[in-house]
Amino acid sequence: MLTDTEGIVLRQIKTSYNRRMILLFSKKYGKISAGTSIQEKGRGKSSLALRPFTYGRYELFKNRDSYNINSADVIKSYYAIGENVDKYMNGAYVLEFTERVLSEGVPAPGIFHLLLDFFDLLESRDRGIGTLVLGYQIKLFKYAGVAPQVDRCVHCGEKKEAYKFSIPEGGILCQECWEKMQNQQDKTEQKSFCTENSQQHTLIYDPEFGIVNILKYFTINSLKNLKNLALKEDTGRLLQKLIRE
């Protein structure tokens, strides 16, 4: 069956017989792998549309469980990203991060447009690139349904002041729930030494440095509203650490 879709190239892999496998984030079908015989070194529109950091339109032959790219046209090439090392490294990281989050064959139009917004901003931005990446990641979590809960306690569900931010629990804890957890943990550790609890303890943070407000701001506002925002380096590093954990 012949079909077409807009898409963003995540990466490409060379295979045998001068063919390549393109990992494509398509608007219509989500993340798909599609083979193609279009030559990489060509200067035609189809060849240019198969490179990473490219937003294009792709004509596909869709089999029951596979895709082949017959032709492609560039809608927009973010070639300027590749001319700056910092932009390129951050852009490549975002493509890899997005690839890990996406499920195979599941359309994700919200994330698709979010990624395009990110590239538009990255191409024109000269400072605070790390802040832009963090904003993208936090909003991506929201679209994927795994964003941390920051408007109410993850245990009791009440809108109380944040006392701790817990990665294992997935959001903020009020003081009452935190103290209950501590008491329960103390009783458990009196019976047996538990290294798992000790390791989880290192994934709980005080919210004093503004993490809750930052997460709320990034979640509520569009990515384009972050274009002039740049976090302090230590705050950015801590947020990146939280995301990776």
Task: Cite the ranges covered by each PLM segment.
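Non-catalytic alpha-helical scaffolds and adjoining flexible linkers that form interface surfaces
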Residues: M1-M21, F25-E245
